[in-house]
Amino acid sequence: MVAEIFNHDICENNVVISPRSETAQDNEGLFGRIGTLETRLARNEREIDAAQSVRYRVFVEEMKARLPAEAMRRKRDFDAWDSVCDHLLVLDKSIEGDSEDQIVGTYRLLRQETALANNGFYSASEFDIAGLVARHPGKRFMELGRSCVLPEYRTKRTVELLWQGNWAYAVKHRMDAMIGCASFPGVQPEAHALALSFLHHNCLAKGEWEAVALPELYHEMDLVPVEALNTRKALNAMPPLIKGYMRLGAMFGSGAVVDHAFNTTDVLVVLPVSSIAGRYISYYGGEAERING
């Protein structure tokens, strides 16, 4: 399940500024900076705990998710995958306090080799990921998940930094494909008939990239005949994050899954790096390679 974050079109004059020459600790693992915002991976357990607090504020307090009792008591969104994932952060350095107080956005990143050595991919609890990965023995997958940004930071620059970090991470670890669950609000797929049908008819992952919702969780996405689809209305009904993935060149798995705990209807994003639109590679790729050497 992924919270919807503000999407944007790339603007040529909005440049991601590379890290300034400050202290070695400040710049350790830094993927990029725009103004007072910067992106990097969490460096310690305190920062991961703070990211879990941000997730709780978005998923529970805002989106009305129902987490296990211990998570609700601690006011943290956490699960078994947190201990093996890398946690991408966006921090606002203008906020006074420690780094934990400055976290305003986060993404959870899981590499294939780490997933296979531990709990598998989170999205495999909803979709047949094993079959997808097995058809690509020479490719390396990474999972994106638990994306969220605090309401007051849902701006172009915050999302640019999150994608800057995602791309830099993918380049650093030589990833070939990105996967992950993206969400529609609510637990009634029929309420999103236009958008789900558009994904089914226009962006369905097929052939070697096919991935299907688990049989016991499968909900049909083909709810409106292709000849009856109004493209404009379908796109207007699409959550921003999903439209963002579409612009990058993503495909989507077959079937939606209702996640009652998070009060969402999930679809599977399948994004081969080779399919990412060229202008995005140019925009994010050059900067990522330059920062990471």
Curated annotation (Swiss-Prot):
Keywords from the UniProt entry: Acyltransferase, Lipid biosynthesis, Lipid metabolism, Transferase
GO biological process, one term: lipid metabolic process
A Pfam family of this chain: Acetyltransf_5
Entry similarity comment: Belongs to the acetyltransferase family. OlsB subfamily.
Function: Catalyzes the first step in the biosynthesis of ornithine lipids, which are phosphorus-free membrane lipids. Catalyzes the 3-hydroxyacyl-acyl carrier protein-dependent acylation of ornithine to form lyso-ornithine lipid (LOL).
PANTHER family, sorted: GCN5-RELATED N-ACETYLTRANSFERASE, L-ORNITHINE N(ALPHA)-ACYLTRANSFERASE
Protein name per its UniProtKB record: L-ornithine N(alpha)-acyltransferase
Organism per entry: Agrobacterium fabrum (strain C58 / ATCC 33970)
Taxonomy of the source species: Bacteria, Pseudomonadati, Pseudomonadota, Alphaproteobacteria, Hyphomicrobiales
